[in-house]
Amino acid sequence: MSRRRAIQPSPALRIGPIELASPVVLAPMAGVTNVAFRALCRQLEQSKVGTVSGLYVCEMVTARALIERHPVTMHMTTFSADESPRSLQLYTVDPDTTYAAARMIAGEGLADHIDMNFGCPVPKVTKRGGGAALPFKRRLFGQIVAAAVRATEGTDIPVTVKFRIGIDDAHHTHLDAGRIAEAEGAAAVALHARTAAQRYSGTADWEQIARLKQHVRTIPVLGNGDIYDAGDALAMMSTTGCDGVVIGRGCLGRPWLFAELSAAFTGSPAPTPPTLGEVADIIRRHGTLLAAHFGEDKGMRDIRKHIAWYLHGFPAGSALRRALAMVKTFDELDCLLDRLDGTVPFPDSATGARGRQGSPARVALPDGWLTDPDDCRVPEGADAMGSGG
């Protein structure tokens, strides 16, 4: 399937009552899409193209930890005062816990949108039957989606579901998952076009997004995988017919990508890529936001991984990179960034894949997991394993 074909600017995306000016969603990413990163993405979109047009999703929290009101989890659900719509992703394996968490979100006004994660390929999650392993148990999957939808009845909070193609090439689940989610009242579905066995390696199979779009007719289908620039997003929508795109690793170290996407989808002029000096200022702003959220010590520890992504493809020198990777205070960060050559233009080598990729691997599953897809027993220990955020 060709990935480069011009299309006209896309219309807005509607997810339940939520209407977006561009069909773009920030994928929830653990340790990344906290309130600081989301605020930075929105601020850059506003400053560069004058819009805040997409949906920016909070990093995943576990349903069990949420209803237990674990302090770390509650802190993870922080939203900016001007953030709208507020979008929260739940990791969940139990219909009862799902219902309680969704009722809590709705009753306490914690968010305006609930997404559910059935796409995590991490072995410690799948070996207990959670994440990307769970949609194989189609009855249990349906009960979980139905519980969240039932808990939000009478509110304006839409429930959406994100999943992968399946466990591996021999066990595709995405068409059943899409059909079930649609039937149980989900407002949209999103497909990461890789199997759990692929993890983040190889190439996303956009053909499976097209198949899901043909299979799910009454709600939006969003595509995720291998979108690193606006051209990729336009190509995915053109070639698959999907209704929107979900941006994950492509925005790591490039939070201005959402401004570029907004411009592409609205037909506006593309913003000029930042120079190294402008990237340094963005890092400073990111560090300020992280320090406000976590405190300076943790905020500076958190910014370290982002700096490696920000400087990808730029000339910085190994000594300066090492110093930035150990930064402890904002003043130190500020001084080190002053040593960069601010006149360096954005290099072509700074685009493309970034973040974790790894290699494909056999998916860790509970014993006997693949025996009966209609077994609706809650996997033992999977709900509690993530308690604490």
Curated annotation (Swiss-Prot):
UniProt entry keywords in alphabetical sequence: Flavoprotein, FMN, NADP, Oxidoreductase, RNA-binding, tRNA processing, tRNA-binding
Molecular function terms, GO-annotated: flavin adenine dinucleotide binding; tRNA binding; tRNA dihydrouridine synthase activity
Pfam family, one: Dus
Protein residues bound to FMN: P28, M29, A30, Q89, K162, N224, G225, D226, G248, R249
E.C. numbers: 1.3.1.-
Described purpose of this protein according to its UniProt entry: Catalyzes the synthesis of 5,6-dihydrouridine (D), a modified base found in the D-loop of most tRNAs, via the reduction of the C5-C6 double bond in target uridines.
NCBIfam families for this protein: nifR3_yhdG
Protein name: Probable tRNA-dihydrouridine synthase
